[in-house]
């Protein structure tokens, strides 16, 4: 599995392009805002002769789908959003105002098939399963590849921290409970690719993350 991270937009969100030897790929959380960021992602896909087959959202905060209109136009892939987060996605203008307290351009194309706990995403010879992880948003999820021991955690789990819960729909203890269950379930050598910041491992977070003690 090949994982390419693109830190994008003013909030330094991590967009991931995940591919394998078949050259099929999934795009996770394309928050590209500036034209040069969008071009950089497209160039990587083109230079590596990749075929994107899905655009997945870990949750529906605007900084994670700023580039969704570009991906939909270029590859014909509407973003797939966790079902409980559809109200956030559909009313993005109100979401932006409530979080930033001012308006900013954020085009959101019609969403594709909802992501549910039963969803299984396949690309090439790999599959991603959905692990619900609410708390940062009502419908936040992680995407897990058991074969490669890789977790894409969105804004639920960060290196030595967790996602904010003071936005509309957030709940601190819901998130902590979900993450404590998560780290008890997954192998310690699972690599965690978060929505912002550096990658980590489940073992490191079990050992060092102050929100997950006990």
Report residues per predicted region.
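Active-site HxH/HxHxD metal-binding segment of metal-dependent hydrolases
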Residues: 33-36, 42-122, 207-211
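Conserved S/T- and glycine-rich ATP-binding loop of Class I adenylate-forming
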Residues: 18, 58, 133
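Short Gly/Pro-enriched turn/cap motifs at secondary-structure boundaries
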Residues: 6-7, 110-112, 132-134
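Short acidic-hydrophobic surface loop/beta-edge motif
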Residues: 6, 18, 119-125
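Residue-level detector of beta-strand structural context in well-folded domains
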Residues: 16, 113, 118-119, 141, ...
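Metallo-beta-lactamase
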Residues: 32-33, 94-98, 126-214
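Conserved beta-strand hairpin/beta-sheet module of binuclear metal-dependent hydrolase folds
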Residues: 1-48, 142-153
């Amino acid at each position: 599995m090949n994982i390419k991270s693109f830190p994008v937009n003013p909030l330094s969100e991590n967009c991931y392009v995940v591919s394998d030897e078949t050259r099929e790929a999934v795009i996770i959380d394309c928050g590209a805002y500036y034209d040069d960021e969008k071009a950089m992602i497209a160039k990587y896909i083109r230079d590596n002769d990749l075929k994107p087959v899905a655009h997945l959202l870990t949750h529906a905060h605007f900084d994670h789908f700023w580039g969704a209109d570009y991906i939909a136009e270029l590859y014909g892939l509407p973003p797939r959003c966790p079902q409980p987060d559809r109200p956030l996605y559909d009313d993005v203008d109100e979401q932006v105002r409530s979080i930033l307290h001012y308006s900013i351009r954020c085009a959101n194309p019609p969403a594709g098939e909802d992501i549910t706990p039963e969803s299984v995403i396949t690309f090439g010879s790999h599959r991603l399963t959905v692990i619900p992880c609410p708390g940062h948003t009502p419908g936040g999820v992680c995407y897990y590849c058991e074969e490669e021991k890789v977790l894409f955690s969105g804004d639920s789990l960060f290196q030595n921290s967790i996602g904010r819960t003071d936005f509309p729909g957030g709940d601190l203890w819901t998130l902590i409970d979900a993450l404590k269950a998560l780290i008890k379930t997954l192998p310690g050598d699972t690599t965690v690719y978060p929505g912002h910041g550096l990658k980590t491992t489940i073992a490191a977070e079990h050992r060092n993350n102050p929100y997950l003690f006990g």
